[in-house]
Amino acid sequence: MEVKAKQLDSVNATASVKIPSGMIKSEVENLAKKASKSVKMDGFRPGKVPVSAVLKRYERELTQDAEQNLFKSAVNSALQELKKESKELVGEPYFEKFDRKDGEIIAELILSFKPEIKLDGYEKLIPEYQTPKVSKKEIDEKKDELLKRFATPEAIKTKRVLKEGDFAKFDFEGFVDDKAFEGGKAENYVLEIGSKQFIPGFEDGMVGMKIGEEKDIKVTFPKEYGAAHLAGKDAVFKVKLHEIQELKIPELDDEMLKKLLPGEEKASVEVLDEKLKEQIKNEKLFKLVNDELKGKFADALIEKYNFDLPKGIVEQETDMQMRAAFNTFSEKEIEELKASKEKYQEKRDSFKEEAQKSVKLTFIIDELAKLRKIEVNDQELIQAIYFEAYRYGMNPKEHLENYKKQGALPAVKMALIEEKLFNDIFMPKTEKSEKASKKEKEDK
């Protein structure tokens, strides 16, 4: 095997590799010999399977493993020539060229190493911003939202017709072709009018009804309705309205304050207002950071700091962006790209600049996190993945395993580090100083 290594810049090197067919064949045979001692095959006793039988059945898998082993050996040889260690590598070696002829393999690999980055003066790049203000009106609106969560429907005493936003207590029975259908009947059912819980047209048909009124409401089941025997069918619901209910919002008394401020010894309207003010401010700040500040800061960092980028990582990121973009391409565009290598390469190259920015920012974020001592431990990582699973109704353990299989855990961890980092950077200085002062007092 021939291996020639060449350093391209501070973080990239190439490894020209030539693997003779005889070496591949020899490695395949070695693997087959090892496998013959443990593989189970009908007609042969354990440990007595002939090498020829193993080769015949598993030649493809053995060849793949052999080539993988030889390339690992080639990479190690290249690292020795470059006077580098394997722990200095970032990402997998990237195949820039791979040819197979008469059993011989000729390949060009890109080996990439982590860049050394100095972020002197990065603080000057942090965008200036005003800590969001919170008005009394916003606090009152947030209080109303909280109280509405504890609201319960109560029957109205005044005489009026049913309107959107009311809760209706009623009986109903549905008919298709003058025949009642299973699951289409209920008594004293309570429904929020306008919630769109029922099929289209039903709730609109109830608007304007009076207490005690009976009415036939004509509707059509959606074509994609879950029950196939009803999908797309016209139906009539016989409805009798018993009660109109309105949400009764509870008073903000001592009992309610204890519910809204669990664990708070001195639960009061003032304490609640202060907590809501802080919550609203943080929500506004979170939006400001994500919509504006984060992008401005990232652009400034990318423009300010220049360093060699690991080519292999950039190529992998370019491939990933290209694959992701395929979902947005038209069928015609996809066919054109498949038919022309030149067009495919041209399209792929259009993602290169964005890929370079993404990779550059990732390394900058990583270095910034170290400077500011931002870390994400395994427990935080698992909690974030479990939370995501619960949010989308998925099995958390399976969701975690999928991330592991895809090798995506480092990307998730990096996203969490980035979130923590920007929260640390953009936390209001007043809040930081208040916390520092409080800690100093406690220490005393």
From Swiss-Prot:
It comes from Campylobacter jejuni subsp. jejuni serotype O:6 (strain 81116 / NCTC 11828). It is found in: Cytoplasm. Keywords: Cell cycle, Cell division, Chaperone, Cytoplasm, Isomerase, Rotamase. Consists of 3 domains; the N-terminus binds the ribosome, the middle domain has PPIase activity, while the C-terminus has intrinsic chaperone activity on its own. Residues 165-250 form the PPIase FKBP-type domain. One of its GO terms (cellular component) is cytoplasm. It comes from the Bacteria. One of its GO terms (molecular function) is peptidyl-prolyl cis-trans isomerase activity. The gene is tig. Gene3D superfamilies: 3.10.50.40, Trigger factor ribosome-binding domain, Trigger factor, C-terminal domain. This is Trigger factor. It catalyses: [protein]-peptidylproline (omega=180) = [protein]-peptidylproline (omega=0). One of its GO terms (biological process) is protein folding. Its main location: cytoplasm. InterPro entries: PPIase_dom_sf, PPIase_FKBP_dom, Trig_fac, Trigger_fac_C, Trigger_fac_C_sf, Trigger_fac_ribosome-bd_bac, Trigger_fac_ribosome-bd_sf, Trigger_fact/SurA_dom_sf. Its EC number is 5.2.1.8. Belongs to the FKBP-type PPIase family. Tig subfamily. Pfam families: FKBP_C, Trigger_C, Trigger_N.
